[in-house]
Structures are given as structure tokens and as C-alpha cells.
Swiss-Prot record:
HAMAP family: UPF0340. It comes from Staphylococcus aureus (strain bovine RF122 / ET3-1). This is UPF0340 protein SAB1998c. The lineage of its organism: Bacteria, Bacillati, Bacillota, Bacilli, Bacillales. It holds the Pfam family DUF436. Belongs to the UPF0340 family. InterPro entries: Antibiotic_NAT-like (IPR028345), DUF436 (IPR006340). It comes from the Bacteria.
Length: 174
């Protein structure tokens, strides 16, 4: 998937991925292949995307989390080593192609020690196919513009975050 490789390379060049961070991935494999979100799904597309992200993880030290679809309330598949019981609640669900989506399913099947959490707050994310990852991005969410606008047929939206600016007109900011 040339466009995915180009996108990930561009994000690496921008220093979008930071060692130790968790980057959220939302993906409709249906949209990638030109179909309506949630209709056909593709484990083959999921495998391609997961493997490309795995390479980025090994190169940059970023960890990826995978958002499931609305049928599992957009719950997040993560490595158990990333679990923080003070800020996350584990839920009892296993992502499935028809309830969770192909990429979350593939990730759950291929991660070392996966668990699913109800909610997560991460500093950045990549949304492939308008899966609505914003609910899991740390405030304040900031769009990231890239030259790659689609992966396959799916629209790509990328977000990072910045600290809130508080204090009013007399406050100073960096």
C-alpha cells in the first residue's frame, strides 16, 4: 500500500511519532477498499496496515493502540504493558470483524499480550476512514496536515495535541 507507506514516512519525517508515546489508530478497512464503513471489512487490508505500523513502532519506539468500531463502543485494543489502572478500565470483549472491525481484530490476534480498555487518552492518532478517534485524543486536539490525504479510498485525518492555554489576557505562553 504505497499511500500508507508515504503517509507513515512523512509523519516520521515530521517527528510525529515519539518514543514511549501511544498513537491511536482508527481504521475502516471497508473505506480503504472503497466501500461504506462497517460493511465488508478486510483482514488482508488489516494485516497490511498492522504490519506497516509494526515497522514504524520498531523504528521510532511509539506504541500503537487500535480503536474498535461503535459496536464495541469504540473500545481500544492495547498491549497489556501499556495498561494504567489509574486512567484506564479494562473491558470484557474480544474484537471481531463484525463487532470491533478488522484492524482491531487483527491487532488483538497478533499483539503479544492484548487487552481491551473502554477509554484511553493519547497524544496523537491517525484516523483512516473517518472512524471518529477524537474522543480518545488528549485535549487540545490539533489537526496535522500531510500531503497524503487518503489510504486506498479512505480519507485520512491526523491529530496531535497541545497543552491547554489557560489564564486569560495576562497569562504568558511558550
Amino acid at each position: 500500500m504505497k499511500d500508507l507507506t508515504m503517509l507513515l514516512d512523512e509523519l516520521k519525517d515530521m517527528s510525529f511519532f515519539n518514543k514511549g508515546d501511544i498513537c491511536l489508530i482508527g481504521c475502516s478497512t471497508s473505506e480503504v477498499i472503497g466501500e461504506k464503513i462497517g460493511t465488508v471489512g478486510s483482514m488482508e487490508v488489516a494485516e497490511t496496515i498492522f504490519n506497516a505500523l509494526d515497522v514504524v513502532s520498531k523504528e521510532t519506539g511509539v506504541t500503537f493502540a487500535f480503536q474498535g468500531c461503535e459496536h464495541i463502543n469504540r473500545a481500544i485494543t492495547i498491549e497489556k504493558s501499556q495498561f494504567n489502572p489509574l486512567t484506564m478500565e479494562e473491558v470484557s470483549v474480544v474484537p471481531d470483524v463484525h463487532a470491533g472491525g478488522s484492524l482491531a481484530t487483527y491487532a488483538f490476534q497478533h499483539m503479544k499480550d492484548p487487552i481491551v480498555v473502554e477509554h484511553i487518552t493519547v497524544p496523537c492518532g491517525i484516523d483512516i476512514g473517518q472512524t471518529l478517534i477524537g474522543m480518545h485524543i488528549k485535549h487540545v486536539c490539533v489537526p496535522v496536515r500531510t500531503s497524503v490525504k487518503q489510504v486506498g479510498q479512505a480519507i485520512v485525518t491526523i491529530a496531535t495535541s497541545r497543552p491547554k492555554k489557560i489564564g486569560g489576557e495576562r497569562a504568558k505562553y511558550q
